[in-house]
Amino acid sequence: MATSAAFLKGDFKRTGKMELSDEQKSQMWINSVNSENKEALLAWVKETGIELVQINGQRKYGGPPPGWIGNAPVSGSEVFIGKIPQDIYEDKLIPLFQSVGKLYEFRLMMTFSGLNRGFAYARYISRRQAISAIMSLNGFEITKGCCIVVCRSTEKSELALDGLPGNFDENMLKNVLDEVTSGVSSISLHPSPTKESQVLAVVKYDSHRAAAMAKKTLCEGSPILPGLPLTVNWLKTDMRQKLRSTDKLQQTKDLSPLPLLYTDRPDLPKETLLSAVGCLNMLCQEMKLGRPVFLIKLFSVTSFGWIRFWYQVVIPTYPTPFCGYAWMIGENLELNEKYEHARQVVAMKILSALGYIPDFSLGDVTARNAL
């Protein structure tokens, strides 16, 4: 051992005590916490040959277990175990939960000191065995006076991505996510409840593991759009309910008649109808606001082909200018086409802010500009 070697070499301070690094002191303290049960765990691991792997604050058995052939068990086969005494380890827990069914995976959440965090997850090979574990072990007295809680695991698989640009659609986001994550099964977009003119995406993955890996990737170094303050969290029940309420309110607004739709006006040229800038110019002319003046500053292209840009639009007799940041796809456009497409994106945002929504999509504008 390093400590013994240092002692034999006479590595002392003048006080006669051996000099230990902060890391060695920390390790000695960790080893001293619950040492008796830790030694029992080590003996059990050696005796059974079971393999436990420490990964990101949890210690895991299986997933899959030795000899497993085939796909992982279906959703609903995992149980949550709560109110575990913090000094109890897998040598007590795994045999207990194996007594009611075959375990595919067992995960015990751990603290830095080596104590458990009071909860774990056990995944069985079938839903029936998970139900059996709940019926048999919920309320089980694992130590004197300590009864554990066993219930169905929610197996979270949905992420909330808040702060996306307002011109994102599901296909754009899926293409980006497929580059950095795997297992996306569905995407829905909603107005952000916290960030004006931006979008919150609910992304459902095909498993909890895929969602957890995606969350880790998106939070730790693979941002969807560099420079964009994107927030990534598990989708919570209160947020789901809030989004549903917002969507219902938006549907009601969508049914209300709009004050003006330029596509209903046969006297306007088709080119004007398909141009957000043209529609904005016509609106400002009819309202006697003056012709809008656009100022656009382009930034670098991201690895996904997105361009971030700053804009300011001054409408002569409108009280305040419109300004901010926006995103667009334009990697393969010429410089003048990039500026024109940025103008179209901004014009759409301003028309929406003024309450006038032309009956065309930016997809039409993109296609026309790309020709």
UniProtKB/Swiss-Prot annotation:
Role of this protein: RNA-binding factor that positively regulates gene expression by prohibiting miRNA-mediated gene suppression. Relieves miRNA repression in germline cells. Prohibits the function of several miRNAs by blocking the accessibility of target mRNAs. Sequence-specific RNA-binding factor that binds to U-rich regions (URRs) in the 3'untranslated region (3'-UTR) of several mRNAs. Does not bind to miRNAs. May play a role during early embryonic survival.
Entry-linked CDD domains: DSRM_DND1, RRM1_DND1, RRM2_DND1
Molecular function terms, GO-annotated: mRNA 3'-UTR binding; mRNA binding
Keyword RNA-binding attached: yes
Broad class of the protein's primary localization: nucleus
Localization, UniProt: Nucleus; Cytoplasm
Protein name from the UniProt record: Dead end protein homolog 1
Domain of life: Eukaryota
Keywords: Cytoplasm, Developmental protein, Nucleus, Repeat, RNA-binding
Gene expressing this chain: dnd1
GO terms (BP aspect): germ cell development; mRNA stabilization; negative regulation of miRNA-mediated gene silencing
This protein's GO CC annotations: cytoplasm; nucleus
